[in-house]
């Protein structure tokens, strides 16, 4: 896999220093630990590229581990989608696929050990009472009345919790740390709770489940992770990460280092999984893989390439400071990649009939268009010119504005790869809509011949033969939100939805495009980049999605 060049950043500097001092004996093991309660989005791609990229760069491995400790919200559908998305991005975890539930037995044994060491206790307060006694950022918490239960009583209660004797919410297991700590995460955090619910992998074996802060540091240690990379919201959780591993130092093979970096904040997007679920469940989009969604499944269906997303992740870099990344950076990475790989084709999206009156009836001219103007080795394709053509309606103006150099009454333009034509008159319906544009052509001006150089015109428009063009469904996608910051706190993000984010039309394309395969990408000349829809394209019946326009049309 080709990866962009790797500029220095603070995490790479940490790894370099660790390798210099021999801290991990040259090992670099990272992990990407998603919770299977939704589809991955572009923000996850930054973490995926960072974790897998660093492991690849330093000859290490990156684990894919599912944090499946909350069975109420998790499903196999999400596991499968996450696996597919990480693979699609171009990364391979080899044999290192893990689940937090793989460690449930060890996590339970470690919890019993913490109880025997006086480092954990069973609390019988309600969730509301625990929250009330936790205190605030400026006030210390208050000890639970159950904090001083004996180790024997705690062990008995914890085992009975596991045996299923108690309903949900009656007891929890808490770490005994410091209720007066200035870090609220160290005020006796809950590490186990009762949940009588079926787990997708362990079935009904367990009715108590470990909390994330307890689980993920131990999972890291058991997998011998060296550098545990997470986003900045976990910075205040790092003391708890270290506390748990310090208490279990005799039980675990290593103590990984947690390192935080700034998450991705992308304009015109929402990253909250809760809000993405809201969009899907309220049918404001057509599922998790809707091409307007910033999920990796949606971006893939929109026509994004893995290479463009990896380029984006590298280009925005890694830092400790939160900042906003403009959507145009992502789109420019996509344009840069598609400009290299997409074959050129012609499509007429809003057709109007054009008739060349002096073109002989039944006659055809073969014209030649390059498959890629920067790559002559990809050859040319044939376009058939006939008496009746389709052009895009926007390429004609009956009363042209100043600076309009396309077709107008009395004006001349070149038909791309073909001849110069001149508009003579138009035919309209009773409502004044133009039905036909009538022209004459100059047969001595065919592109690629000596005559093409004898006359120059400023306008150059694309066209398709009405005889050979094929009608197809084309979906014109645009940004899902009209507000650059729809996720602003205190604002209903749904009021920023773009009512014009999807338009379905019937357009005309070159006949060869009827054989387009799902995910095959093209540049529709003068329009933008399009892809044959991954989900809905059938044999001989492609549906094309607009991936991105040729240039940014959004005002900053």
UniProtKB/Swiss-Prot annotation:
Species whose genome carries this gene: Nitrosomonas europaea (strain ATCC 19718 / CIP 103999 / KCTC 2705 / NBRC 14298)
Gene: glnS1
Keywords from the UniProt entry: Aminoacyl-tRNA synthetase, ATP-binding, Cytoplasm, Ligase, Nucleotide-binding, Protein biosynthesis
EC number(s) reported in the record: 6.1.1.18
Classification via InterPro entries: Gln-tRNA-synth, Gln/Glu-tRNA_Ligase, Gln_tRNA_ligase_bac, Glu/Gln-tRNA-synth, Glu/Gln-tRNA-synth_Ib_cat-dom, Glu/Gln-tRNA-synth_Ib_codon-bd, Rbsml_bL25/Gln-tRNA_synth_N, Ribosomal_bL25/Gln-tRNA_synth
NCBIfam families assigned to the protein according to its UniProt record, in alphabetical order: glnS, PRK14703.1
A cellular component term, taken from the record's GO annotations: cytosol
Family: Belongs to the class-I aminoacyl-tRNA synthetase family.
Positions that bind L-glutamine: 67, 212
Protein name, as recorded: Glutamine--tRNA ligase
Reactions listed under catalytic activity: tRNA(Gln) + L-glutamine + ATP = L-glutaminyl-tRNA(Gln) + AMP + diphosphate
